[in-house]
Amino acid sequence: MSISLSESAAQRVSAFIANRGKGLGLRLGVRTSGCSGMAYVLEFVDDLNDGDTVFEDKGIKVIVDGKSLVYLDGTELDFVKEGLNEGFKFNNPNSSGECGCGESFNV
């Protein structure tokens, strides 16, 4: 099982954690939402929960809960800039499609 970050995502997360001044890393998860069924969740982590799995890539700890791991295995978190827009992009090999608005995905 693995979760990875692109170089641009690692730099961005590192900057966010440095600006925040504390934190173990970044939690990556999924929740039920949207028209396709699931949406990604990103949040800072200060403490680990029972059942969390910790991945480390490019010096950044990515924490995933046990229920989300099956949907996220093999995912690469990227940070992209497209014109005036910028944001995190999830390159998830388990995703079989997204809704039209791009807010949710299915497997």
Curated annotation (Swiss-Prot):
Q: Name one GO cellular component term.
A: cytosol
Pfam families recorded: Fe-S_biosyn (PF01521)
Q: Which residues bind Fe cation?
A: C35, C99, C101
State the UniProt keywords alphabetically: Iron, Metal-binding
Q: Which domain of life is it from?
A: Bacteria
Q: Which GO terms describe its biological process?
A: iron-sulfur cluster assembly
List cofactor names only: Fe cation
Q: Which GO terms describe its molecular function?
A: 2 iron, 2 sulfur cluster binding; iron ion binding
Q: Which InterPro entries match?
A: Fe-S_cluster_asmbl/transfer (IPR050322), FeS_biogenesis (IPR000361), FeS_cluster_insertion (IPR016092), FeS_cluster_insertion_CS (IPR017870), HesB-like_dom_sf (IPR035903), IscA_proteobacteria (IPR011302)
Cofactor binding description: Binds 2 iron ions per dimer. The dimer may bind additional iron ions.
> Can you state the subunit structure given in the record?
Homodimer; may form tetramers and higher multimers.
- Which HAMAP family does this UniProt record tie to the protein? Fe_S_insert_IscA (MF_01429)
Family designation = Belongs to the HesB/IscA family.
> What biological function has been recorded for the protein in this entry?
Is able to transfer iron-sulfur clusters to apo-ferredoxin. Multiple cycles of [2Fe2S] cluster formation and transfer are observed, suggesting that IscA acts catalytically. Recruits intracellular free iron so as to provide iron for the assembly of transient iron-sulfur cluster in IscU in the presence of IscS, L-cysteine and the thioredoxin reductase system TrxA/TrxB.
PANTHER family cross-referenced by the UniProt entry: IRON-SULFUR CLUSTER ASSEMBLY 1 HOMOLOG, MITOCHONDRIAL, IRON-SULFUR CLUSTER ASSEMBLY PROTEIN
- Name of the molecule in the record: Iron-binding protein IscA
Organism source for this protein? Answer: Pectobacterium carotovorum subsp. carotovorum (strain PC1)
Query: Which gene is this protein's source?
Result: iscA
